[in-house]
Amino acid sequence: INLIAKAINRKNKINGKIKNLSSVVAKLMNGSKPTSSLINTISQCYPLHPLVALLLSPLSRQRFGQNERSIFTFLNSGEPNGFLHFLKNSNTKKELYTVDKLFDYLQVNLEPSILVSNIGHAWSEATEAIRRAEVTDDIKSIKIAKVIALVDLFGKNLSLFSSKEILMHALNQEKTNIKNTLSLLEDKKIIIYRNFKKAYSLFSGSDIDLDQVIELNKSKISGDMEKHKDTIVKAS
């Protein structure tokens, strides 16, 4: 993160909103109060969204086939959906380079190499889930799916998971505004909520909804007890 912060030359002043967002994301990363130094460093990565700044580190250590990309390759690349492309085509006073944009960059420029890498299968499942999200024709749903995809792939070593709070800040949305979108994606089996992580993941065909299984078994046990209650009472 320090390397990213030093590599970016900013013309616009970093405002309090960016520092607050950096603080929130840093806290959500490990669940403890972040140091002022970490918050400041993440803020200095503006106009990268704080989540992008964090994910670039594990991403840059990933080798995609023969294609070796460093953080500096990404920052200096004029490829479609890349950082330089964003700087030339966006109002950085109002807009951040967000996680969904990073996903688009990887898909457009690196997907063939990613598919033959050690995360190729996971990437393929992620793009299939995103394709199903695109069928909804809802921009927010598509963006959420892309954020979850990259956090699933690269956030684990950072203790970073797609909680409601992370997704809310990734899209700059209020929690109430994101709730309906998450419900829609769950109903369509595009994402799944994992209680043990308190976070969402993309749904794959092999996933089992444990909460649903538990509820079904509870109902079955309750029904069996009701059915045989007379026998139980007599035996006692």
What are these regions (language model features)?
Residues 1-82:
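Amphipathic alpha-helical segments of the small helical/lid subdomains adjacent to P-loop NTPase cores
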Residues 62-236:
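Extended alpha-helical interface modules used as scaffolds for assembling large macromolecular complexes
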